[in-house]
């Protein structure tokens, strides 16, 4: 990016914004790239602004008990803000003086006033000079205020982000993503938009006082009649605004519901397609959309009436101001036209500028208070290490995630006077509800010496991760002592990849040591994966490492932790996504050998890991079940495997015991129904209130399996006898106050969000503990749309020592300067929809022909306009054929100081009424406005329906190219624009064009010479608009692209916050965030500057036009006093309205870009058409292109498939048409009812094969089910043959019944039967409403095991004969998995089952195994054959596992085999040399 020329520009260049001309010229001639944009001036850089505001905020905190952020902002920006305010006031004052000169010019036409006539030309020059002065004052002032607003936003963005990195985990768990979105994306944008109007809080009253003084001098008491009408109008607008807010509040809930379900579908589009739910989901969303549009229309009508009332008031304000005066004194044309000009300015000040300024200040103070509260929140405390400690010591440590109970617990504590409950279970009692919470860790004692390895194990929610958080300082111990000896390194259970290269992710800002780096890469088995990339370890990884498999991400995260030279390594389940082949290699070479001399704490559930650990800690419900060595464990706790690890002794349990385990062990949340009347059948319940809104999907829910969260009834609670109304709160993805206002035309990102990651309410900690897709790299590419891109805001810093945070404890490599804007853009891989710089005519044509009634409405608008023009021409005809004889019909009355012209009947007065009424009719336009707005909203409904259908039926290869956030933006921001902004903007543009054309006709009829001046002005306006639009729209697009990395970086930082803190890399990420801010600032600053360039030149053209009109009028009108007044008044009206019309056309073009983006999605090729095209290209018998179902029995859905036999012939799978084959020429067959296990390294293509079975990818070859080929069956019929359990469990917001049977195909009896069969009945019965109980937020009240059972139930209900299971045991503790394993055996006894798993024990029920390696079938045989000497499968099973699982089977034949790896086998001596 080039340096900004503003810093070296001359005063004249700055005044006229000429320094932007090169970028405008380049944008008109060529396509603008990021490198073409100038850097933001140094005064606008995020580093400078952040440090400036941070310094003042720290000073404010240090000096006062109650620090105020407004004071820190005042010290930073006040004086420049005041200076530009004074300039703005001087520019506005000229508007009040212009009518005075206009009245003097009109008065000069009095035949007896020869003095005034002689100076008329000088009065005209003075009037023109006022316009010039106003232009020179107004535009620099507006630009300066916009720039200050941009600087304030940038500074607070940075401050909030820094604070986010320092907040305690307890505070983060209370902050929702929606709150952050509202705090930043919606609220802070108001500085950009509103600061230019903030000064009217004092300018408007001064201006009204001045105008009323001048009107009093002109009309005396009559002037207050018009002011009274304006005040009434303001009250009327306030009433309409209140009604509009009511409709918007009702609409907000429906928009939220629609966007939540839409985001859930986008996030789980793979599952929706696999279940064949496209039609059901489409119908569900369209029903919500229909209700939403009813509220949208009502709100639009209110806005329409408000806007119309503003224009409609123009005539009546003038009429009421003049009428009392004319009744007493007669008609005085000079005063009439002067009053018109005064009232135009007065109306704008009273009805628009002052109310808007009041609203801006009100919103700004409220927003600043929110940010201030945020900046004062509690920060996390780093656990200081003790150099005297040899390893790590814990003594009687107990810890609570107290804030995890949400604000309901907080409210209870406050209402009880913060009294501590002495009960062991910390019960908090209500009148009919109970919230029960236990400590997440209780009385933990351990002592690890330096160099030892501690293995921590236990069931889900036992407190394993919480223990690591204690050591990191993320969780504060409520009692006990914790000591450790030195620096800590951390590997999270949830792999986190930052935007950057593979090498940067591993080094993570630490000094580069080549030998250490290569040793770590080798030990983590990354060499083979790195060699597959063209750029090797310099390959740039995008958002969340989307190009990597789950196993690759996990190993990079592990390598990052190992590369750091630390004294203590915390490894939280680092092998969860690794296949059995890789896991054993990484554990041996990395954890056991490379890190042999380091202190390690490993969270694991593998028996082999426990055997090799120096000490073992088994946690159960937060308590220490066992602490000691493995030999001690075997002697003291022989039952631990069956009780906590859940191995095959589960099979020995009785049926009743298994049912108990199902309903008790899996349950994270329990319902205390001791007093709640849940037995009432028709009582409506939802997860609402404080618990429902504050604690959904929190990390704490995963930590504490014994903590009970009550389902809050939708009725008032009584706490200590006081009623507390719990209102149902919803996170709206668009602003509460104005659903459409979030969708600013200059931004392509939804101002909400997001994240819309399929959760209606999600705490920040959920981001850190969200389970990403764990499939192979290939599957991940096909499911790019599943990843989340919550558009979340940033948070700020609150620390007394400003500079201490910048110090790093490790030796770091300063790579700040190596990060340029291009790299930053590449890292975030923003989704950019390529559309032309200016909206094409084809887009307008498609839009206006979308609805048959829209063309009729437009024709009606033109007819109404022609009637109005005809009326104006008729009045002109009367005027010319009935000239006023001022000598016979008029009287001349002389005042003491003024000569007044009075006309008797005055056709001029009639004509003046026409001028007012004509403008009013054109502005109000009820008969054409309401139908137009109504029809345009209907067009928005059609576009939404078509786009939804297109996305749901789009191929996965197409969706993989789009971001989830980008798709959701179309359904949120762009649809909001189509609903709220576009209808009224198009209406405004049409009526403004009609006003201009009508006024030109009138003026040209009165004075034809003016028409000659108007035509060149119109041509220049149109050409200048086209010239500006080419660059402006490109700058907006670049600005929008620059906005995405800001929020993406924040989300990325939040997901890896624990890792960032553990590595002390906050400063590095602050620098990266500032780079993103500067990139956005550069684009937005250029757009503001070029906009001022355009607006100033529009004003300059207007000044030239008015000069020409004024002098033509003065020199050619002669004695026509009324004609001169009409011409000058309408000339001012023409050009001001034409300016408005040009700006409105630019707004229309900007908003129509949303229509263009929607059309891009609508035009996406559907899956069915894509496969039809593929089938047509296949060699077929005969020449017919028509698909023919050869197997007649397929048409009968109850017959096919009957057995579940599969035959795969020469199957080749690609993700893209032009991509490499992931699987190549695969052939095999599966017998009916057979169970087949898929084996292979991470990324070998196991999940890809399952996707190919479902026809999710580009496939060639043939797949047959019971003799029926895939190319002879429709896509929906083919997928219905399969029952699917995907890696990512999909629970959408809806009832149990809807989640199990969204098509409404089955009766309750059948659903209950299946629920009982899979073990889900006892779970559903515990919820109020049972099958009608509404699940929200991804079913947060269910454990992961329950959700898997829901998927099993869906497959059973589908009556499918072939079941595809993609890692169903991922993130399940052993007991939970044994329950699901038992259900699988019983529910799908007669079905063909294809299972992809990483757990060896999970595969033991399979009769045959398909081993995939290097894109081909390596082996396909039975278990016995795979355990033979020549099998590669046996290397993944240790000798102890063979003895355990396969006693008597081939145990004597075991010999070590060559590993499938590109790494060379290390000798023990080599390992010793490379230990850390």
UniProtKB/Swiss-Prot annotation:
SUPFAM superfamilies: ABC transporter transmembrane region (SSF90123), P-loop containing nucleoside triphosphate hydrolases (SSF52540)
Region described as Interaction with GORASP2: 1382-1476
Tissue: Expressed in the epididymis (at protein level). In the initial segment of the epididymis, detected on both the luminal and basolateral sides of the ducts where it is expressed in the duct columnar cells as well as in the interstitial smooth muscle cells. Expressed in sperm in the caput. In the cauda, detected along the luminal border but not continuously and is also expressed on the basolateral surface. Within the caudal lumen, detected on sperm. Isoform 1: Expressed in a variety of epithelial tissues including colon, kidney, lung, small intestine, pancreatic duct and testis.
Annotated compartments: Apical cell membrane; Early endosome membrane; Cell membrane; Recycling endosome membrane
Topology feature Extracellular, residues: 99-122, 217-222, 320-339, 875-913, 1007-1008, 1112-1125
Membership in a protein family: Belongs to the ABC transporter superfamily. ABCC family. CFTR transporter (TC 3.A.1.202) subfamily.
Assembly mode: Monomer; does not require oligomerization for channel activity. May form oligomers in the membrane. Interacts with SLC26A3, SLC26A6 and NHERF1. Interacts with SHANK2. Interacts with MYO6. Interacts (via C-terminus) with GOPC (via PDZ domain); this promotes CFTR internalization and thereby decreases channel activity. Interacts with SLC4A7 through NHERF1. Found in a complex with MYO5B and RAB11A. Interacts with ANO1. Interacts with SLC26A8. Interacts with AHCYL1; the interaction increases CFTR activity. Interacts with CSE1L.
Protein name per its UniProtKB record: Cystic fibrosis transmembrane conductance regulator
Organism: Mus musculus
Lineage of origin: Eukaryota, Metazoa, Chordata, Craniata, Vertebrata
């Amino acid at each position: 990016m080039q340096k900004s020329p503003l810093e070296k520009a001359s005063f004249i260049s700055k005044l006229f914004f000429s320094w932007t001309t090169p970028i405008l010229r380049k944008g008109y001639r060529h396509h603008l790239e990021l490198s073409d944009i100038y850097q933001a001036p140094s005064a606008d850089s995020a580093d400078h602004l952040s440090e400036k505001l941070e310094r003042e905020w720290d000073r404010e905190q240090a000096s006062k008990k109650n620090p105020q952020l407004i004071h820190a902002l005042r010290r930073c920006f006040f004086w420049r803000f005041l200076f530009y305010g004074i300039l703005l006031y001087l520019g506005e004052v000229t508007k009040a003086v212009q009518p005075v000169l206009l009245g003097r010019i009109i008065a000069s036409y009095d035949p007896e006033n020869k003095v005034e006539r002689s100076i008329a030309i000088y009065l005209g020059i003075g009037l023109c000079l006022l316009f010039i002065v106003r232009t020179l004052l107004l535009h620099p002032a507006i630009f300066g205020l916009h720039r200050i607003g941009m600087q304030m936003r940038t500074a607070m963005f940075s401050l909030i982000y820094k604070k986010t990195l320092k907040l305690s985990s307890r505070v983060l768990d209370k902050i929702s993503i929606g709150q952050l979105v509202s705090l930043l994306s919606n609220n802070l944008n108001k500085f950009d938009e509103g600061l230019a109007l903030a000064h009217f809080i004092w300018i408007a009253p001064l201006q009204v006082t001045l105008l009323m003084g001048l009107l009093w001098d002109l009309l005396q008491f009559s002037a207050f009649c018009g002011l009274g009408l304006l005040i009434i109008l303001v009250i009327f607008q306030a009433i309409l605004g209140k009604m509009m807010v009511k409709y918007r509040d009702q609409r907000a809930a429906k928009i939220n519901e629609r966007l939540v379900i839409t985001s859930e579908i986008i996030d789980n589009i793979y599952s929706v397609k696999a279940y064949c739910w496209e039609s059901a989901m489409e119908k569900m969303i369209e029903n919500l959309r229909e209700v939403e549009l009813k509220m949208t229309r009502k709100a639009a009508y209110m806005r329409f009436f408000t806007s119309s009332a503003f224009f409609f008031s123009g005539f009546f304000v003038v009429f009421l101001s003049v009428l009392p005066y004319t009744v007493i004194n007669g008609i005085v044309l000079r005063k009439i036209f002067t009053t018109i000009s005064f009232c135009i300015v007065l109306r704008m000040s009273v009805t628009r500028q002052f109310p808007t300024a009041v609203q801006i200040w009100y919103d700004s103070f409220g927003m600043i208070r929110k940010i201030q509260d945020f900046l004062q929140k509690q920060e996390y405390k780093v656990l200081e290490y003790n150099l005297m400690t040899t390893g790590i010591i814990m003594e009687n440590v107990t810890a609570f995630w107290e804030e995890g109970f949400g604000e309901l617990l907080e409210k209870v504590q406050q209402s009880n006077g913060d009294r501590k409950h002495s009960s062991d279970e910390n019960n908090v009692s209500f009148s009919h509800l109970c919230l029960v919470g236990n400590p997440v860790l209780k009385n933990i004692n351990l002592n690890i010496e330096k160099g030892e390895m501690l293995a921590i194990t236990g069931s889900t929610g036992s407190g394993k991760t919480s223990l690591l958080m204690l050591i990191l300082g993320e969780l504060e111990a409520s009692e006990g002592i914790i000591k450790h000896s030195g620096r800590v390194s951390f590997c999270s259970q949830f792999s986190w990849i930052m935007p950057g290269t593979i090498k940067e992710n591993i080094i993570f800002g630490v000094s580069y040591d080549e030998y250490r780096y290569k040793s770590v890469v080798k030990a983590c088995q990354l060499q083979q994966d790195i060699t597959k990339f063209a750029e090797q370890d310099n390959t740039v990884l995008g958002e969340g490492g989307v190009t990597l498999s789950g196993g690759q991400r996990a190993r990079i995260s592990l390598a990052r932790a190992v590369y750091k030279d630390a004294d203590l390594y915390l490894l939280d389940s680092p092998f969860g996504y690794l296949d059995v082949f890789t896991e054993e290699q990484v554990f041996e070479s990395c954890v056991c050998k490379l890190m042999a001399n380091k202190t390690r704490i490993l969270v694991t559930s593998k028996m082999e890991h426990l055997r090799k650990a120096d000490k073992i800690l088994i946690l159960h419900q937060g308590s220490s079940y066992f602490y000691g060595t493995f030999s001690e464990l075997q002697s003291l706790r022989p039952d631990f495997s069956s009780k906590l690890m859940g191995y095959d002794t589960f099979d020995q349990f009785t049926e009743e015991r298994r049912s108990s385990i199902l309903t008790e062990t899996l349950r994270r949340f329990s319902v205390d129904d001791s007093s709640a009347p849940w037995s009432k059948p028709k009582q409506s319940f939802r997860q609402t209130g404080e618990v429902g809104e504050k604690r959904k999907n929190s990390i704490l829910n995963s930590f504490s399996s014994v903590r009970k969260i009550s389902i809050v009834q939708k009725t008032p609670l009584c706490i200590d006898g006081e009623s507390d109304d719990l209102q149902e709160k919803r996170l709206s993805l668009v602003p509460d106050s104005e659903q459409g206002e979030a969708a600013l035309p200059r931004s392509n990102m939804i101002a909400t969000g997001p994240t819309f990651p399929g959760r209606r309410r999600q705490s920040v900690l959920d981001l850190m503990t969200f389970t990403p897709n764990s499939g192979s790299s290939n599957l991940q590419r096909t499911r790019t749309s599943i990843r989340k891109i919550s558009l979340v805001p940033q948070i700020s810093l609150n620390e007394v020592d400003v500079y201490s945070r910048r110090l790093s404890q490790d030796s770091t490599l300063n790579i700040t300067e190596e990060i340029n804007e291009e790299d930053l853009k590449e890292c975030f891989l923003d989704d950019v929809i390529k559309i032309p710089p200016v909206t094409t005519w084809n887009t307008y044509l498609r839009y206006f022909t979308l609805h048959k009634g829209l063309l009729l409405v437009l024709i009606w608008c033109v007819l109404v306009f022609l009637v109005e023009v005809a009326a104006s021409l008729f009045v002109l005809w009367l005027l010319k054929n009935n000239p006023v004889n001022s000598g016979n019909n008029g009287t001349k009355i002389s005042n003491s100081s003024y000569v007044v012209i009075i006309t008797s009947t005055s056709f001029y007065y009639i004509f003046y009424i026409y001028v007012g009424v004509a403008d009013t009719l054109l502005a109000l336009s009820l008969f054409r406005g309401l139908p137009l707005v109504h029809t345009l909203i209907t067009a928005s409904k059609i576009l939404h329906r078509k786009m939804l259908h297109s996305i749901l039926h789009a191929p996965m290869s197409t969706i993989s190219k789009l971001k989830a956030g980008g798709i959701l933006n179309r359904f949120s921001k762009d649809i909001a624009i189509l609903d709220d902004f576009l209808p009224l903007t198009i209406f405004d543009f049409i009526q403004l064009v009609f006003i201009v054309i009508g006024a030109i006709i009138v003026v040209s009829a009165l004075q034809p010479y003016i028409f000659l001046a108007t035509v060149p002005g119109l041509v220049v306006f149109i050409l200048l608009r086209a010239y500006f639009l080419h660059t402006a729209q490109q700058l907006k697009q670049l600005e929008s692209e620059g906005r995405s990395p800001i929020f993406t970086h924040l989300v990325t930082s939040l997901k890896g916050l624990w890792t960032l803190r553990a590595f002390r890399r906050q400063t590095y990420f602050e620098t990266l965030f500032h780079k993103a801010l500067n990139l956005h600032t550069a684009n937005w600053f250029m757009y503001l500057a070029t906009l001022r360039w355009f607006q100033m030149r529009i004003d300059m053209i207007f000044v030239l036009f008015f000069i020409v009109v004024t002098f033509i009028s003065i020199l050619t009108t002669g004695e026509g006093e009324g004609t001169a007044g009409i011409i000058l008044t309408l000339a001012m009206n023409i050009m001001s309205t034409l300016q408005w019309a040009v700006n409105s056309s630019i707004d229309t073009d900007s908003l129509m870009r949303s229509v263009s983006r929607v059309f891009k999605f609508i035009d996406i090729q559907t899956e069915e058409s894509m496969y039809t095209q593929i089938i047509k290209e296949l060699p077929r018998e005969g020449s017919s292109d028509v698909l023919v179902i050869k197997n007649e029995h397929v048409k009968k859905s109850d017959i096919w498939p009957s057995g579940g036999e599969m035959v795969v012939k020469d199957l080749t799978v690609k993700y893209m048409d032009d991509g490499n084959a992931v699987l190549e020429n695969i052939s095999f067959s599966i017998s009916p009812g057979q169970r087949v296990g898929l084996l292979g390294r991470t990324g070998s293509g196991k999940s890809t094969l399952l996707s190919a079975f479902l026809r999710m990818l580009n496939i060639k070859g043939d797949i047959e089910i019971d003799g029926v080929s895939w190319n002879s069956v429709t896509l929906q019929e083919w997928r219905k043959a399969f029952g699917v359990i995907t890696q990512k469990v999909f629970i959408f917001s809806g009832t149990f019944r809807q989640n199990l049977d969204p098509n409404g195909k089955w009766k309750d009896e059948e659903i209950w039967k299946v629920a009982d069969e899979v073990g889900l009945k006892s779970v559903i019965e515990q919820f109020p409403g049972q099958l009608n109980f509404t699940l929200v937020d991804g079913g947060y009240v269910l454990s992961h095991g329950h959700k898997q059972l829901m998927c099993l139930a869906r497959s059973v209900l589908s009556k499918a004969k072939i079941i595809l299971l993609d890692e169903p045991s991922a993130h399940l503790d052993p007991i939970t998995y044994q329950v699901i394993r038992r259900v699988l055996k019983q529910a799908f006894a007669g079905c063909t089952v294809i299972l992809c798993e990483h757990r060896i024990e999970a595969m033991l029920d399979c009769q045959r195994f398909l081993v995939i390696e290097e894109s081909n079938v390596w082996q396909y045989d039975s278990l016995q054959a795979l355990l033979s000497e020549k099998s590669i499968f046996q290397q993944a099973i240790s000798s102890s596992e063979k003895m355990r699982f396969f006693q008597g089977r081939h145990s004597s034949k075991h010999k070590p085999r060559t590993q499938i790896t590109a790494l060379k086998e290390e000798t023990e001596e080599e390992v010793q040399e490379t230990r850390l």
